[in-house]
């Protein structure tokens, strides 16, 4: 892994960009890495565009700035790509993962990005298993498969710790299942 691995998640309020960023950071922390995770909001209402940042490093992180040149961008809501330049600053060798059924070539045209681009229908996965549009966990599964930035087992552990007291065993099991489906189904 490079010195600092940076991830930017774009979504809409209520889709889990903030919690996805936190879950990823906590999984990295479990592995002994230094982390930062923080959101940036526009108007704070459900459905408003949001962005969340995660920084993961083997050494102490001293600056607390937005991620301008990410190694990976996750887009939880395909529709925001029409109004937000989600690939802005994305490293040339970075990856773009989008929650959509649209093929990578069409995503690249819309995003203005020619680098590695992947899609996963994370909304359908979350609707099928949880009956809610919270695509963050399947998107994290895709990110882990494509980058290895954290181990799948680390994120499973964080999901258990985070959600068991709040949601119970059944929803934890479904979140872990969504993580694995995201890992298995991401496509180029």
Predicted feature residues:
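Active-site cofactor/cluster-binding pocket
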Residues: 1-188
């Amino acid at each position: 892994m490079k010195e600092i691995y940076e991830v930017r998640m774009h979504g809409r309020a209520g889709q889990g960009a903030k919690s996805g960023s936190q879950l990823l950071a906590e999984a990295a922390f479990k592995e002994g890495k230094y982390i930062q995770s923080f959101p940036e909001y526009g108007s704070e209402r459900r459905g408003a565009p949001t962005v969340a940042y995660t920084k993961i490093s083997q050494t102490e992180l001293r600056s607390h700035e937005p991620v301008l040149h990410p190694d990976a961008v996750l887009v939880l809501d395909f529709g925001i790509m029409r109004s937000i330049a989600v690939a802005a600053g994305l490293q040339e060798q970075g990856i773009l993962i989008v929650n959509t059924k649209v093929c990578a070539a069409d995503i690249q045209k819309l995003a203005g990005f020619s680098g590695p681009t992947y899609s996963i229908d994370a909304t359908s996965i979350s609707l099928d298993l949880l009956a809610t549009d919270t695509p963050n966990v399947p998107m994290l599964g895709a990110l882990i498969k494509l980058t290895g930035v954290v181990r799948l087992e680390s994120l499973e552990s964080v999901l258990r710790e985070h959600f068991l007291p709040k949601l119970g065993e059944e929803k934890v099991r479904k979140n872990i299942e969504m993580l694995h489906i995201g890992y298995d189904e991401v496509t180029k």
